[in-house]
Amino acid sequence: MSEPPAIKPADAALRAPGLLRAVWVRIKEHRMVQWTLAYLAVAYTLLHGAELLGNSLSWPHTALRLFTLLLILGVPVVITLAWYHGARGHGRLSATEIMVIAILLAVGGVLIWRDTATHRAAEAERAAAAEESPGTAAPAASIAVLPFADLSQAGDQAYFSDGVAEEILNDLSHVSGLKVASRTSSFQFRNTDIGIPEIARKLGVRHILEGSVRKAGDTVRISAQLIDAASDQHLWAQTFDRPLTTANLFGIQDEIATDIVQQLTSAIGTAGAAVGRPALPEADTASLDVYDLYLKGHALFLARTKPNLSEAARLLRAAVDQDPKFARAWESLAAVLVISRFWGLTEEQDYVRAAIQAADQALRLDPGLSLPYAVRGIAQANLIALGQEGSWQEALAQLSEALTRDPRNASAYLWRSGTYFNLGYLDRARQDAERCLDADAAYELCRRTLALVELCAGRTDAALRLYEAGMARGYVNADVYFAPVAAARGDRLGLLGILSQQYRAKPQLLQSLYRSLTDPAFGPQERKEALPLIDRQHDDPEAAMGGYWLLKDYDQIAGVVNDSVAVIWSRSDPEWLKSAARKSLIERWRMPAYWRAQGFPPQCKPLGRADFTCP
């Protein structure tokens, strides 16, 4: 059998135009060009109209971007439809074709969602970076103290090395004319691969102090290096080897602080801002064991979780039992106790009064402390939340006294902001939350408090920017109040994310709350079945209060013991704003009496001598 003749390249080239002509004939036969041009004309008109409407109604940029992506996605769909149905007499779609189009749209929708989610995450990161990154060069008289490395053989002394770094930071923070980055801001760069210049840029400082601590038997070695971030050069370095005693520890810390100030003064020169001298405290306990207990307890308080707080209270109680004159141990114990009741700890029934007693003892030993005054203040507000005798006037007076003694006390700003927020003074609450972030830019609870205040004040876009910045850092708290906003904007994925933060352990409740916000068919019977899933005695108070609120069982809200009543000022539920339960909650928190004495917040007003309204 003979082989067929081979096709020469020249023959193939001659056939190609015939193939192209055949394809062009099919394209014309199916009127694909007409379909595509018609679609592009309609799409252009729609896009232009959407742009005009968006500008007049101040739509977010992402809405126009999403609409554009949808129109682009329609091009291949139109071409496909034209191929199969452009010829005359082929106007109906089969079930298979409808399914294919649905799959294409679904895939396109997923791609658009991923693009939009990535865009939103990037926006949140940019917002976070904008808050972290100063717009001008860092002042020469500025420094951040990074967490000192734990070089102990067992590697279990991080709390101790952190304590050494924090003591030095505290010494430097009281030096006049010197800007010192907060502990929270600086310590977030623990074990990071970011270079010193970049860390300094993010913190808005010119100089970085880093170091290490090694405990070995009865001796301690502390090394420290001062770095000029602008040149990435070491300005000063020193290693201290001493017997391990509290007097020596404080002596080393004081030497480092003094040397740092001297080096900065020399580096800044006569043209720079004047830098004062560090006020060097004396060792306030002679017992190394007691100091070790204090450092462990204090570290657990700063990294607070429910188990951490219980252990922190135990360690700090042991410290004050062994040295009743250790003022800072009493101070930290007071701070642990005052927040424990609202973190769900129940081992001791009267945490708040125990906190007041510890704060009083700390001030008897050292009247110059700031935090005990803040504890006294927030304790008064907490007593009101518990239905006991407390005073709003005393709460605010004590918190203000704390800030008089230490204007950089971020916790005092946070607690005073929360107190103003509970009372409905949203402008004052916003100012203190902003001051808290000025004092400690990495204090995420301050950022979330500010987001809630902005939300309740009707500044929704600003609130969402702050909320997303916190979420980008992994912060979770009071998310439930943002759920109705996501639902109203049609952001179902965002809604699920918000609800999951507080209800992931109860998937059935999560599903019910999601449906209550998205499904018009979600009715009274389903609400009734969902309510028992909330345990107001053991659930997170914010989650329990928010769950009742979303399910519209307003009468149950007052039964939740919580240190915050942000729910009172949330404006996303018109029924709640007019409810008797809301007014009753305001009265239970004894706000009207304070308002009549000190002035009503702008959104409320008196009605005669005994009544009020807060529409």
Model-derived regions: residue spans:
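Conserved structural position within tetratricopeptide repeats
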Residues: 320-321, 360-364, 400-404, 435-438, ...
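Alpha-helical protein-protein interaction modules
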Residues: 399, 412, 417, 426-615
